Amino acid sequence: MAWFQVMLFVFALLLRSPLTEGKDPDFTSLLTNQLQVQREIVNKHNELRRSVNPTGSDILKMEWSIQATTNAQKWANKCILEHSSKDDRKINIRCGENLYMSTDPTLWSTVIQSWYNENEDFVYGVGAKPNSAVGHYTQLVWYSSFKIGCGIAYCPNQDNLKYFYVCHYCPMGNNVMKKSTPYQQGTPCASCPNNCENGLCTNSCDFEDLLSNCESLKTSAGCKHELLKTKCQATCLCEDKIH
């Protein structure tokens, strides 16, 4: 009988071990291979993108990306708790990245809201207030980012922050030259009057510019130039789209 009680005690300890804590229902309900989780993440992002202040005229509606999700989950699984390289989060275009670490399973909506709340330290047209970090916010609302994919991992190798959240945004935002204006201020959808859904633009571009002066190059050299064919695809192929 005593032996049986000891075995029950050992079994109870195993149930509380770090290797199994991460598999509890609270964690598994956050896995992003579930359609309802994907919808929660996309809907929360679009809700917040609609609510920016001042309002934006060119903010794209976000959609789920399987490719971006695969990359985000791969990085989360490494449990390094730092940003990945740009190559690790590239699909056909480069993607940005937001990270979140937690001691306990946290709802995706709560995670995303925490990124958005950095707007309290952001002044449109000026940038971050002194000694403040706002990169999560600016990437979340970046006007041309429209594909999103996220992943979550349980990291027993970490002492405290055992839950690692990763979201990839494509195309990437936080362009240094535009970081104080992550979108164009104006009436919602003013930049896309014929491609609007509930205050967000739907005329997205699947290409990106790799040079900052593509518009002037298009005027001077034209899109048939070999340089523009490879470095200015958004400018040349997405003339009537947000990019």
Swiss-Prot record:
Belongs to the CRISP family. This is Cysteine-rich secretory protein 2. One of its GO terms (cellular component) is extracellular region. CDD domains: CAP_CRISP. GO terms for biological process: cell-cell adhesion. Residues 1-22 form the signal peptide. Interacts with NSUN4 isoform 3. It holds the Pfam family Crisp. Residues 42-169 form the SCP domain. Keywords: Disulfide bond, Secreted, Signal. Residues 205-238 form the ShKT domain. It is found in: Secreted. InterPro entries: Allrgn_V5/Tpx1_CS (IPR018244), CAP_dom (IPR014044), CAP_sf (IPR035940), Crisp-like_dom (IPR042076), CRISP-related (IPR001283), Cysteine_rich_secretory (IPR013871), SCP_CRISP (IPR034117), ShKT_dom (IPR003582). May regulate some ion channels' activity and thereby regulate calcium fluxes during sperm capacitation. It comes from the Eukaryota. Disulfide bonds join 189-196, 192-201, 205-238, 214-232, 223-236. The keyword Disulfide bond applies. Its main location: secreted. Testis. SUPFAM superfamilies: Crisp domain-like (SSF57546), PR-1-like (SSF55797). It comes from Mus musculus (Mouse).
